[in-house]
């Protein structure tokens, strides 16, 4: 079975993204976009420093690639404390979490990415750690088992998730500072691209940066990746400065259209449009038709299509909008007006 080729515009982390740490902003003042989140964080951080206390636990919610990890690092840097990072799937058992927590010093920041994927048994251990700064561990087995309490330094837990709905209510309620991150505007992405070009020593015209920003799907991680690919074309073509024309040529050859859709997006839209009459159709059916996992569709493909007005999630399934048919150059089918609010179809898998 052939392996699905990697998508250029996926917001998932790829190896090349990890090598560009120097492009990341180091302070809230340097961070572009997410104005409300930055303003609130600056107030909470200043207040915590003035009280000489640990910052309340923070939860970042939003699609991949919007800066959750970067903001977590900035929080630690602005507080002047140590930063430790892990992820939900890595913490397999209570001992793994205990090792992380007992290594923390006063007011340190522990970042848990994909916190919605924590083992339920580990999550139970996390509750008293977040609330009372204590670890309740069971030592031994059977009749000889005993409970041991370990005092922890007062720390800040920063969680990140793309699936807030999968968090249990007890865990979600223990975060005093919930922050939702939004997709970036083209203007914000343009500034990010221009900054990245300066760091890389690449001459980039403003119009060229705008062309890259328009195709970056509202996501800085994708903008950085597109910039690197355009840079490759500039080097091979031997041009001194990246213009809009060069950026358009490079990204068109890479099959990224003027609004950032790629072959996978168009395949998704075409499956619903041509195979299922524009919908509504259930997510499991779409996943089977595309031979893609449901999580990847919900986390990576759909958020941008919804944000662009191409797709609706309804009680009966996924439904393409007239805007999607116009973009695909297809005629919209005549559909009966759905009475979603009256008789919701309980068979939808969402």
Swiss-Prot record:
**Which residues are ATP-binding?**
23-24, 65, 68-70, 131-133, 174, 184, 221
Is the DNA-binding keyword given for this protein? yes
Q: Is DNA-binding found in the keyword set?
A: yes
> InterPro entries, from UniProt?
AAA+_ATPase (IPR003593), AAA_lid_4 (IPR041445), CbxX/CfxQ (IPR000641), DNA_helicase_Holl-junc_RuvB (IPR004605), P-loop_NTPase (IPR027417), RuvB-like_N (IPR008824), RuvB_C (IPR008823), WH-like_DNA-bd_sf (IPR036388)
Q: In its UniProt record, which GO terms are filed under biological process?
A: DNA recombination; DNA repair
Q: What is its EC number?
A: 3.6.4.-
Compartment(s) where it occurs, according to its Swiss-Prot or TrEMBL record? Cytoplasm
* Renumbered residue ranges of the record's region Large ATPase domain (RuvB-L): 1-184
Q: Which SMART domains match?
A: AAA
Q: Which GO terms describe its cellular component?
A: cytoplasm; Holliday junction resolvase complex
Q: Report keywords, A-Z.
A: ATP-binding, Cytoplasm, DNA damage, DNA recombination, DNA repair, DNA-binding, Hydrolase, Nucleotide-binding
Positions that bind DNA: 294, 313, 318
**A Gene Ontology molecular-function term?**
four-way junction DNA binding
Gene3D superfamilies noted in UniProt:
1.10.8.60, P-loop containing nucleotide triphosphate hydrolases, Winged helix-like DNA-binding domain superfamily/Winged helix DNA-binding domain
User: Region entry Head domain (RuvB-H): which residue ranges?
Assistant: 258-350
State where Mg(2+) binds: 69
Xref: Pfam families: AAA_lid_4, RuvB_C, RuvB_N
What is the role of the protein in this entry? The RuvA-RuvB-RuvC complex processes Holliday junction (HJ) DNA during genetic recombination and DNA repair, while the RuvA-RuvB complex plays an important role in the rescue of blocked DNA replication forks via replication fork reversal (RFR). RuvA specifically binds to HJ cruciform DNA, conferring on it an open structure. The RuvB hexamer acts as an ATP-dependent pump, pulling dsDNA into and through the RuvAB complex. RuvB forms 2 homohexamers on either side of HJ DNA bound by 1 or 2 RuvA tetramers; 4 subunits per hexamer contact DNA at a time.
Xref: NCBIfam families: PRK00080.1, ruvB
Its assembly, as annotated, is: Homohexamer. Forms an RuvA(8)-RuvB(12)-Holliday junction (HJ) complex. HJ DNA is sandwiched between 2 RuvA tetramers; dsDNA enters through RuvA and exits via RuvB. An RuvB hexamer assembles on each DNA strand where it exits the tetramer. Each RuvB hexamer is contacted by two RuvA subunits (via domain III) on 2 adjacent RuvB subunits; this complex drives branch migration. In the full resolvosome a probable DNA-RuvA(4)-RuvB(12)-RuvC(2) complex forms which resolves the HJ.
Q: Report the sequence similarity comment from the record.
A: Belongs to the RuvB family.
For domains, the record's comment is:
Has 3 domains, the large (RuvB-L) and small ATPase (RuvB-S) domains and the C-terminal head (RuvB-H) domain. The head domain binds DNA, while the ATPase domains jointly bind ATP, ADP or are empty depending on the state of the subunit in the translocation cycle. During a single DNA translocation step the structure of each domain remains the same, but their relative positions change.
* Official protein name in the record: Holliday junction branch migration complex subunit RuvB
User: What organism, scientifically named, is this protein from?
Assistant: Beijerinckia indica subsp. indica (strain ATCC 9039 / DSM 1715 / NCIMB 8712)
Gene name of the encoded protein? ruvB
């Amino acid at each position: 079975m052939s392996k699905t080729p990697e998508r250029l515009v996926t917001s998932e982390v790829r190896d090349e993204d990890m090598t560009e740490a120097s492009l990341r902003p180091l302070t809230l003042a340097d961070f572009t976009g997410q104005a409300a989140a930055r303003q609130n964080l600056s107030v909470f951080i200043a207040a915590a420093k003035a009280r000489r206390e640990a910052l309340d636990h923070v939860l970042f919610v939003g699609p991949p690639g919007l800066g959750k990890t970067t903001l977590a690092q900035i929080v630690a840097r602005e507080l002047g404390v140590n930063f430790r990072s892990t992820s939900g799937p890595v913490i397999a058992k209570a001992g793994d979490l205990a090792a992380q927590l007992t290594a923390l010093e006063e007011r340190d920041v522990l970042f848990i990415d994909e916190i919605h994927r924590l083992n339920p048994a580990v999550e139970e251990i996390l509750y008293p750690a977040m609330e009372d700064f204590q670890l309740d561990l069971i030592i031994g087995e059977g009749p000889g088992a005993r409970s041991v309490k370990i005092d922890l330094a007062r720390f800040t837990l920063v969680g990140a998730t793309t699936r807030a709905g999968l968090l249990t209510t007890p865990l979600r309620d223990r975060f005093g500072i919930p922050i939702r991150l939004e997709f970036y505007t083209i203007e914000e992405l343009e500034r990010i691209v221009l900054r990245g070009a300066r760091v890389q020593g690449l001459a980039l015209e403003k119009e060229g940066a705008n062309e890259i920003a328009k195709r970056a799907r509202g996501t800085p991680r994708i903008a950085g990746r597109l910039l690197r690919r355009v840079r490759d074309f500039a080097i091979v073509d031997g041009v001194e400065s990246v213009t809009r024309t060069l950026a358009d040529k490079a990204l068109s050859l890479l099959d990224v259209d003027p609004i950032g859709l790629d072959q996978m997006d168009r395949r998704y839209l075409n499956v619903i449009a041509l195979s299922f009459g524009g919908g509504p159709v259930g997510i499991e059916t779409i996943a089977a038709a595309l031979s893609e996992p449901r999580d990847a569709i919900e986390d990576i493909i759909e958020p941008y299509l919804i944000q662009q007005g191409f797709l609706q999630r309804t009680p009966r399934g996924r439904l393409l909008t007239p805007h999607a048919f116009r973009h695909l150059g297809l005629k919209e089918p005549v559909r009966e007006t759905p009475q979603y609010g009256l008789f919701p179809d309980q068979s939808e898998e969402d």
